[in-house]
Amino acid sequence: MERTFVALKPDTVERKLVGRVIQRFEDRGFEIVEMRMLTLTMEMAEEYYGEHKGKEFYERLIKFMTSGRIVAMVIKGERAISTVRKMLGNTCPCDAEPGTIRGDFGLYTPANIIHASDSLESAEREIDLFFGR
């Protein structure tokens, strides 16, 4: 079984969509093995999104991700990383297919509901950052 990291962004919490998004993962047979709600500090957000430092959207992303509570999760299941990424849809909600999480709930970037690890290495790094392993 593979594990991946998923973060429900501040817009998901604010719009009371947490349960609906989690239900999608459970309906696909995934298991939520760890979960916590927190507000990112500036330092944690900068470490989390360090790969984007210097890009035009970086400051806006950091400001958004520290604007409210997020839900950090570890999800386990068969091919979790690739399947969860497909379930999310395109990063930009306007380009995401209906039936995907971003297509159904996303508003705009960065308020696109959710983040999920894109590789095994990213999943391990993000799980360690949020759950201390």
Curated annotation (Swiss-Prot):
Keywords: ATP-binding, Cytoplasm, Kinase, Magnesium, Metal-binding, Nucleotide metabolism, Nucleotide-binding, Phosphoprotein, Transferase
NCBIfam families: PRK00668.1, PRK14540.1
Cellular localization per UniProt: Cytoplasm
MF (Gene Ontology): ATP binding; metal ion binding; nucleoside diphosphate kinase activity
Gene3D superfamilies tied to this protein: Nucleoside diphosphate kinase-like domain
Family per similarity comment: Belongs to the NDK family.
Reaction catalyzed: a 2'-deoxyribonucleoside 5'-diphosphate + ATP = a 2'-deoxyribonucleoside 5'-triphosphate + ADP; a ribonucleoside 5'-diphosphate + ATP = a ribonucleoside 5'-triphosphate + ADP
One BP annotation, GO: CTP biosynthetic process
Example of a GO cellular component annotation carried by this entry: cytoplasm
Main location: cytoplasm
Cofactor(s) this protein requires: Mg(2+)
PANTHER family recorded: NUCLEOSIDE DIPHOSPHATE KINASE
Residues forming coiled coils: none
Name of the molecule in the record: Nucleoside diphosphate kinase
